[in-house]
UniProtKB/Swiss-Prot annotation:
Pathway per the UniProt entry: Glycan biosynthesis; glycogen biosynthesis
Protein keywords: ATP-binding, Carbohydrate metabolism, Glycogen biosynthesis, Glycogen metabolism, Nucleotide-binding, Nucleotidyltransferase, Transferase
MF term (GO), any: ATP binding
Enzyme Commission numbers on file: 2.7.7.27
Function comment: Involved in the biosynthesis of ADP-glucose, a building block required for the elongation reactions to produce glycogen. Catalyzes the reaction between ATP and alpha-D-glucose 1-phosphate (G1P) to produce pyrophosphate and ADP-Glc.
Residue sites binding alpha-D-glucose 1-phosphate per the record: 108, 173, 188-189, 207
Subunit annotation: Homotetramer.
Name this polypeptide is given: Glucose-1-phosphate adenylyltransferase
NCBIfam families: glgC, PRK00725.1, PRK00844.1
Catalysis performed (reactions): alpha-D-glucose 1-phosphate + ATP + H(+) = ADP-alpha-D-glucose + diphosphate
InterPro entries linked: ADP-Glc_PPase, ADP_Glu_pyroP_CS, GlgC_bac, GlmU/GlgC-like_hexapep, NTP_transferase_dom, Nucleotide-diphossugar_trans, Trimer_LpxA-like_sf
Family classification: Belongs to the bacterial/plant glucose-1-phosphate adenylyltransferase family.
Length: 423
């Protein structure tokens, strides 16, 4: 059987489960009203669109999305933008909100518990393989390649991993592997002595939060874990170390299945879990040749499409023309005679005359008043920035009125603006 037919048969036997219930507390006020996977990204998308698009483009058409924290925005997005799969062809996105299905006592207590509480639904679909995905990372990956790698290996679990510098290991689950990619150790966020990639002293393999299990093996693991009172019911902390101890875990390097892939191509994967990382990943897209290609017709990023007119850039009432460079602008935006560089504007943003905007991420339905100066600012949905406001130039004022990171990125929300207007 050739690889194409083999992959086709495999993904027909697989179901993906996207874990999208996390708050993402390190994003601070950006997740006050929405779960992290529902946060806007890249000018028109939501973070979860990347994992879901990877499923679709990989041929995985049976998908469950597990939700919990402030899920309304996420559920609405999925209902409006992801309802095109055909149920009669056994294609679906099944929304799985926390509903105390098992003991009527607990909401989801960890990533493993979130899957366990939907174990009856999983079993009803009868997949041979379960692909467990984090819904809060930015990357493009062909899961069918990882699935084929898993099926051919004979292991009962395969863990997606990405190469990182050893000094970053403290923030990830780190795995040690042998020459055959068998995972020999797994340490969640090691403070020191992180295992390195064979043949290197300064590079590590970090878990991507992507796991493929033989379904029966997964069910057994979850049923055993739920009875362990010492467990935190988390894949990284509890399930994967158990699998490693049973010699059943294979490492799958991201470079094998990233999109695009090949010699000289640096795999692009970002955990946008902090304001700085979120800002940087968005601005990556404003580069002349961004590492993440969102224009790839062969691997599109799908999302909800609102019917909007094209973006418009016009002179102000005095005839002053604006200058727009290295900037992404979504539908419905209108900019009057302003200078904008290295920025992203989501849908229905209005920038009035005389503004200077540099390295900013501006979410939908924001109005920027006349003569504002904004630098390294993330502006949440629906903000009305008063005329003449300066943000990003005075660290003391920024920290007093908004949230400012150590790297100087300023987060502005509607609540912050409203409170500032009341002073």
């Amino acid at each position: 059987m050739d690889n194409h037919n083999s992959s086709h048969q495999l993904y027909k036997k697989a179901m993906a489960l996207v874990l999208a219930g996390g708050r993402g507390s390190r994003l601070y006020n950006l997740t006050d009203t929405r779960a992290k996977p529902a946060v806007y990204f890249g000018g028109k998308f939501r973070i979860i669109d990347f994992a879901l698009s990877n499923c679709l483009n990989s041929g995985i058409r049976r998908i469950g999305v597990v939700t919990q924290y402030k899920s309304h925005s996420l559920l609405r997005h999925l209902q409006r933008g992801w309802g095109f799969l055909r149920g009669e062809l056994n294609e679906f996105i099944d929304l799985l909100p926390a509903q105390q299905r098992v003991d009527e006592e607990h909401w989801y207590r960890g990533t493993a518990d979130a899957v366990y509480q939907n174990i009856d639904i999983l079993r009803s679909y009868g997949p041979e393989y379960v692909i467990v995905l984090a819904g809060d990372h930015i990357y493009k990956m062909d899961y069918s390649i990882m699935l084929r790698d898993h099926a051919q290996s004979g292991y009962k679990c395969t863990v997606g991993c990405v190469e990182i510098a050893k000094e970053e290991a403290y923030a990830f689950g780190i795995m040690g592997i042998d020459e055959n990619r068998k995972i020999t150790s797994f340490i969640e966020k090691p403070k020191k002595n992180a295992p390195t990639i064979p043949g290197t002293t300064d590079r590590c393999y970090a878990s991507m939060g992507i796991y493929i299990f033989n379904s029966d093996y997964l069910y057994d693991l979850l049923e055993e874990d739920i009875t362990n009172k010492e467990s935190s019911h988390d894949f990284g902390k509890d399930i994967i170390p158990r699998v490693v101890s049973e010699n059943q875990a294979l490492a799958h390097p991201f470079s094998m299945s990233c999109v695009p892939r090949g010699e000289g191509i640096q795999p692009y994967w970002r955990d946008v879990g902090t304001i700085d990382a979120f800002w940087e990943a968005n601005l990556d897209l404003a580069a002349n040749m961004p590492e993440l290609n969102i224009y790839d017709k062969d691997w599109p990023v799908w999302t909800a499409q609102e019917q909007l007119p094209p973006a418009k850039f016009v002179p102000d009432r005095n005839g002053n023309h604006g200058v727009i460079t290295n900037t992404l602008a979504s539908g419905g935006c209108i900019v009057l005679g302003s200078e904008i560089s290295k920025s992203l504007m989501f849908s229905k943003v209005r920038v009035l005359a005389g503004c200077k905007i540099d390295q900013c991420v501006i979410m939908p339905e924001v109005v920027v008043g006349e003569n504002c100066r904004l630098k390294k600012v993330v502006i949440d949905k629906g903000c009305d920035i008063p005329a003449g406001m300066v943000i990003g130039e005075d660290p003391i004022e920024d920290a007093k009125n908004f949230y400012r990171t150590d790297k100087g990125v300023v987060l502005v929300t509607k609540k912050m603006i409203d409170e500032l207007k009341e002073k």
